[in-house]
Amino acid sequence: MTKEKRLIATNKTEEERDRLTEVWKKRIVSEKGYSETIAERIAEKVKSLADYMQYGHAIIAYYRQNGSFQLVTGTLISYSKDFHHSYDMKQVHSTFIFWCMEEKGWRTFLIENFLDWKPIV
């Protein structure tokens, strides 16, 4: 692949990620009533979480749909093995899936219920 083609592919990926951020922002604003600035911060944090969890473990804070607070350790390392295809963030429209280390199973949370995350190093 030439340098020019790689640059075009990288730009296309960035455009897709930006569109995804916009979709998540609209969802967060409509569901929670947050400002666009706060919604954008949340969307960016979810993107960085997804990027990190493909190769490592993270502590994730979020609310369940019933309102209970959750603080769990999660990862996406085994995603491709379990689902037989690679993780694609563009497929995340409203629900984020992850492997919960405590419960030893796949769990989800709604994007608008996400609070924060920290890497486990």
Roles of regions detected by a PLM:
Residues 2-68:
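Short glycine-rich, low-complexity segments
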Residues 57-59, 95, 106:
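Short, acidic/polar N-cap/turn motifs at the starts of alpha helices
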Residues 60-62, 96-101:
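SH3/SH3-like beta-barrel fold
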Residues 64, 68-89:
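Acidic, low-complexity, intrinsically disordered interaction modules
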Residues 89-97:
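Short aromatic-glycine-enriched beta-strand elements
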Residues 81-82, 103-121:
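Structured surface patches comprising rigid loops and adjacent beta-strands/short helices at the edges
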